[in-house]
């Protein structure tokens, strides 16, 4: 059973996948910052890879008031790095729709290597085949 308000630790993998799908569908139908923030929230804890193939995930902490902060904490090995929501929004506005050769093509923005990996996983950008090999998704989706 899926309850939209249920914490992700308490729902099944299938329900979590549905939650992410619905958030992305909502954003594609109405591409507002608020709806994209919903996508970011649902993908917290999911594994991504950078341009060079290094794995990472992110978490979003809650502030004293119980609301989520607009800061992503990138979990890479032993250290965490913060990534500001404003950086993600800036990069989002720089997507032109074509294959994005490298992270800096989306702008000289702090944390871009992580944003690039996230945008690829979200299906917002395409990357060259040699980069797909590193990022682990070279499969042709139409070949089945």
Regions found by a protein language model. Give the residues of each.
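BZIP DNA-binding basic region
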Residues: 1-22
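Long, low-complexity, charged/polar intrinsically disordered regions in eukaryotic proteins
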Residues: 20-78
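Basic nucleic-acid-binding interfaces
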Residues: 27-43, 90-106, 117
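Short, contiguous, well-structured surface segments enriched in hydrophobic/aromatic residues
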Residues: 79-83
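Short, compact, well-ordered microdomains
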Residues: 95-140
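Short acidic DE-rich linear segments
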Residues: 143-144
